[in-house]
């Protein structure tokens, strides 16, 4: 990008309904910038021209052709200044800011609780008073227990309040089982990364202190991988998918003398160059890493749990699909989710991938890489669906579905 060819960073651009009609919310999915901007439709179009290849003049011409009116160069430059100050443009200002944040993260002995006080209660007493009644109200099935050496769960990573019932269903079932010594937590790297899997050795801060990581398993995985598992470690800084499970695990065993150590793994998307979906079993570094994970767990004499932190379908305007969101859309998404979950309950990793890929991921299921990794890591015999919900957002005409599954 040059000063005359501005480039917007990769942002979440979410349609929202306001008193002025439909507008667009700009926010940083990496949470490096705390600022959010709401812009009207015409400015959103103008921003789409800021891809590093168009000059300000070319963007101005495209705007005139689209809307039939002139937007002045001064107005465009004022907009670019606001975006740069908000750290939403790919500029040297932003890159320097990012370098400072990465240096700060590397220097910290622990991974800070990025979402405490926002997504969940910051203090231990407040967390317990909120979440213990939720677990008490959950009713784990009488005929399905996680009594094997390697208990496994799928739990959401959606908003912890909106998905509280699903989280509680998963962790109430785990609470009935013998305590694991370690837990592999398979999250989703929502903001990308160069490696298919990203680890960190940093303990996770929670309302109950710092939850230690399992250095033994992490070191074995790092040695077995064909790539640097720490190359994108900074992605862990703000990623919520592992954090939410770490917090709930620490809560579950906070009164025990020892808590399980965790293995935090962020899973990347499975794609070839050109954007085509790729069978992860055919991608050498992915397959070798998962084979190593399976072998490490099998050879470990301790009780090792595996948790996939995964949501299901993402549909509607927020995810690039035209409104309105109808009951038919919800029914089709639910049918697709259930087809995926049938493969999960059978422990069929390849079947899961085939259902996922058959329509080029039309339903934007973000959690498949973590679920697939779980099914490759353990010999699953059967599963039980514990909870399922579709959370709709009327303001954005969108819906995210999630659930919880016990596996053994």
Where are these regions (language model features)?
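Acidic, low-complexity/disordered tracts enriched in E/D and polar residues
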Residues: 1-49
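Short, charge-rich amphipathic segments
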Residues: 7-18, 98-103, 180, 212-223
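C-terminal functional modules of predominantly eukaryotic multidomain proteins
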Residues: 15, 23-25, 329, 400-408
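Glycine-centered secondary-structure boundary/capping sites
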Residues: 20, 68, 87-89, 205, ...
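Long, charge-rich, low-complexity alpha-helical segments
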Residues: 31-118, 124-125
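Active-site histidine-anchored catalytic micro-motif
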Residues: 109-372, 376-382, 388-397, 406
